[in-house]
Amino acid sequence: MSKIRVWTDGRWSDEISGLDKVYLIKTAIQSQLYLISYEDAVEALEGFEINHYRVTDFLDKDGDYYNEDGIVNQKKEESFLNYLNKKIPLSQVQSFIMPLAVLKVMKTKEPSLAAIYEKIISATKAPIPTPKGYCLNIKFEDE
């Protein structure tokens, strides 16, 4: 488990516990990619950052996951998340930025974690109405 803090109002929130950071990162990315086809992965991952790297930029620089048209190559032996974990070990991630809308969808899809997701959402103190593309800045600390 990890201690989670959310950046809000110029400071880090109180810690939120009860959720593994690797699970949060993988679930957030999977839930976003689930809504679209893998061909649209670059657009779908806009707003996601891991350890201050935009996920889309990091993968673009690597070059071997995309074909010459910029379309994601489906490698049969490894999933997108396994590929990402090889490039950025998710267990070592200290910061994660993700769209708030993705976390709201996750809250409705996973009733067993809805209370923890709601704590994270509430800690953001996001403006209402929330602007399109609004992202959470999350910091992880080991428990």
Indicate where each model-derived feature is located.
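Acidic (Asp/Glu-rich) sequence patches and key acidic residues
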Residues: M1-E143
